[in-house]
Curated annotation (Swiss-Prot):
It comes from the Eukaryota. Component of the cytochrome c oxidase, the last enzyme in the mitochondrial electron transport chain which drives oxidative phosphorylation. The respiratory chain contains 3 multisubunit complexes succinate dehydrogenase (complex II, CII), ubiquinol-cytochrome c oxidoreductase (cytochrome b-c1 complex, complex III, CIII) and cytochrome c oxidase (complex IV, CIV), that cooperate to transfer electrons derived from NADH and succinate to molecular oxygen, creating an electrochemical gradient over the inner membrane that drives transmembrane transport and the ATP synthase. The chain crosses the membrane at residues 34-60. Pathway: Energy metabolism; oxidative phosphorylation. The modification N6-succinyllysine is found at residue 25. It is a single-pass membrane protein. This is Cytochrome c oxidase subunit 7C, mitochondrial. The lineage of its organism: Eukaryota, Metazoa, Chordata, Craniata, Vertebrata. It comes from Bos taurus.
């Protein structure tokens, strides 16, 4: 009796918790606009790549 009610509860929870599915729906940013995505990825990866160079430049120019 208890097992059946638990099983019914878990299946009803799964049925009620439906999210959108498909490509690009399970990531925290939008992939609908490819140019905006390109700009955001360039900023994200470019800032990580450029940071050491700016740090070294700052250290070399510091008195």
């Amino acid at each position: 009796m208890l097992g059946q009610s638990i099983r019914r509860f878990t299946t009803s929870v799964v049925r009620r918790s439906h999210y959108e599915e498909g490509p690009g729906k399970n990531i925290p940013f939008s992939v609908e606009n490819k140019w905006r995505l390109l700009a955001m990825m360039t900023l994200f990866f470019g800032s990580g790549f450029a940071a050491p160079f700016f740090i070294v430049r700052h250290q070399l120019l510091k008195k």
